[in-house]
Regions:
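Short acidic-hydrophobic, aromatic-tinged amphipathic segments that line or gate anion-handling sites
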Residues: 19-23
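Generic recognition of short, well-ordered alpha-helical segments
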Residues: 15, 133, 137, 151-154, ...
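GNAT-family acyltransferases
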Residues: 24-145, 157-172, 192-222
């Protein structure tokens, strides 16, 4: 599954390896498990909190995710028209391969440990904004039945820590100006509103930025 590149070993044939490593400093059980899951197209665990498990989505999750998206108020939504279930299923292998296995990002399932139920989705995705600007954007959506219980903050707080571990410097989120609960969550996490507008967005969409090195905010609000 993994191959070790040894510069002193002469010619190596590592063509069958799913992952090539050059050292062992950052190799642990979690890393090996993720490589195994990606090589076998299985959902890998992203992070955990006392109440939640955040993991990559599987095709079996898509009907529930589509139902979750339908709860999102159209007038406060940021993204465009939602795809049908058939379209989501057709596109999922490409999404999994690009987002999860190549970019090591994506939207992930948020699962309540006690019940084992999916209660939302959250994650980070690479985006291209104005004039080809590359950013990493945080998105989150919690099932209406589980809102106002701190789940959104708990999941996103863990994801911010994970994003920093994966090398992110800044994270951004786009929020409709009337979505007061989402704005409050972003501010609680440490996001600050910036004077920036994404060209394809409606004028009501605001942009917030988070500095991943802001450990003090994470510690104080954890």
């Amino acid at each position: 599954c993994m191959g070790y590149f040894n510069p002193d070993s002469g010619k190596q044939d590592l063509s069958q390896a799913a992952m090539i490593i050059e050292g062992y400093e950052e190799i642990d059980a979690r890393f090996v498990e993720k490589v195994y899951c990606h090589n076998h197209h299985l959902p890998a665990v992203v992070c955990e909190t006392p109440r939640l498990l955040v993991r990559e989505m599987s095709e079996a999750d898509l009907p529930q995710m589509l139902a979750l998206n339908e709860q999102n108020s159209t007038e406060n939504a940021v993204e465009g028209k939602e795809k049908t279930l058939e379209e989501e299923i057709e596109n999922f292998p490409s999404y999994r391969r690009y987002m999860y296995e190549l970019c090591d990002m994506g939207y992930w399932a948020v699962i309540e440990k006690q019940s084992g139920k999916i209660i939302g989705r959250a994650g980070i995705e690479p985006k291209i904004w104005n004039q080809g600007r590359s950013v990493v954007e945080l998105g989150y959506l919690i099932d209406a039945a589980y809102q106002r219980q701190g789940y959104g903050y708990e999941a996103c707080h863990a994801i911010l820590l994970e994003a920093k571990e994966r090398g992110a410097k800044y994270l951004y989120c786009r929020i409709h100006s009337e979505n007061k609960s989402s704005i409050a969550l972003a501010k609680k996490l440490g996001f600050l509103k910036i004077d920036y507008h994404v060209e394809q967005d409606a004028k009501e969409i605001e942009v917030y930025r988070y500095v991943c090195g802001n450990d003090r905010v994470l510690q104080e609000r954890g």
